[in-house]
Amino acid sequence: QWPDGDKKITTDYGFVNGSLDTDGKMAVGLTFLNNHEVFTDYNLFQVNGAFAYNININSDWKLRLGIEAGYANKNYNFSSILLADQITKTTGSITDVSGDPSLAGYKESFGYFDISSGLLLYDDNFWFGVALKHLSTPNIAFTDVADVPLSMFLSVQGGYSFDIGSFDFIFRDDVNLLVTANYMRQSQYNRLDFGGAFEFDKFTLGTTISLNPEGKSDESQILTSINPFASIQIQRFVLGY
């Protein structure tokens, strides 16, 4: 985000997963997340292991249950902070060390364990899912004496794929209209994303809209972003933007 400015934020995410059996009922995965803020030198690295189990309710409906657990490390370079007692009033020179007691007891890095779970109900056209992260509400304070629990994160999502036939005057492939929605909430913060996409045989074209449904001030904006996207599939390779 903001790659050319002082507020640059870089996020890297990777994953690998696979089935444990031939019928695809059980699967495991591994995820990696690294988030870095240039302007604060704050960094979060997390690695999680995941397990999912699929239940065939009947010939059409399926229920997938999942759990994820892992370890996270937060790092904040307090040495990059400039405090008032480091500035010499007469000359304006800056010293490297601060005697400010407010920094006493702070740790530059610490780690914690985290756990999440979720479920997904779906058939060939419809899906509905719920996920709850940070079930253990770990303490994320940078001091040993403080208690700052990480609030649980709730995500509720759903979608439906409509078969709208073919556009013979443009494409001869059948076209599906995909409609999706996702509500997220953590503590007093919330967000609602919804959108749609046309799914052709080899590519997808659509857009999503992000809303702030519960504004916390008179200056809060309901519409926060409009996000178009597209993808193309070549055999088993998918390229999206």
Question: Where are the language model's segments positioned?
Answer:
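Subset of outer-membrane beta-barrel
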Residues: 1-241
